């Protein structure tokens, strides 16, 4: 039996929270909906049903540690275990239970934060110092995520990555390849740079009813007195002065009066994760099926990564070679001749394209940036740019409106 939950972690200098939502219950609450929720239900009805979804919300602050051990216990109970089941005929059986936690960018952030929390919760005298350590670790993760070498060489991050969490992970950020949702070319080198899509962008695609961006009210005298005035660099500063510094909200201190809005924001993010599952269930089922059929871990893999893992598994089985014996083997090329990669069956009927084909067969490139090869072809009234990135038509910006008198044909 698999217990599925979605979760999200939030950290501030004085507060740490984790929100869990029961995925099965969420799906049951909206089982009658097809497509986006807003296509079927009113906002009022959506909110009503969301309020009824099973949620578990935990937070600790520098002044409130009442939920600390509850959170630790909640996480530890996710360890794989057996439960005793008795059917109507009094037959007793042992049923294996595991927890699968769904999230967004969990492999590179939330899982590490949970691991660090479980490694550290009993090492500090009070939650003030525990949260300080969690906050500093969070900043380190964010700082190093664009530097993969430093990220994987950092001792603290490595310990968290290797920590055996009590649950299995399904990272939808990876599943839907949102870590490389689009790309741009570096203007100097031509190198392809991947661009990710955040949860807020995803919520727009899902037509989610509420687009939330967490925003704290301006710093007031209470926050200055309790926190900022105790920091040497801000001692004597007014609230107005500190507000003008443009401090990020996630680097602010969450006063008790702001806890509920923060938790609502956190829960909304988790609901969006659940909605991703509801709208794309086949993608999730596919990964469970492949994992069961082939015994490879693909719950957090994009389709391209699944194909690579499958091919590696099947090739290893067919050849008897260990994956490490062939995965890194490759042919290093300093020169690429187009003649070697243009298939012989490619032929054209028009003289213009026949000449183009022959000229391209004579081309050799020594790098793959945008300046290595580029040519423009004017064919049947449309200009095309052929380069290392592919072929694209060159069109002037315009708006074309069809009617019964005109048929617009584009050869691209």
Task: Label the model's feature ranges.
Residues 1-3, 80, 97-99, 405-406:
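Short coil/turn segments at beta-strand junctions that form active-site/ligand-binding loops
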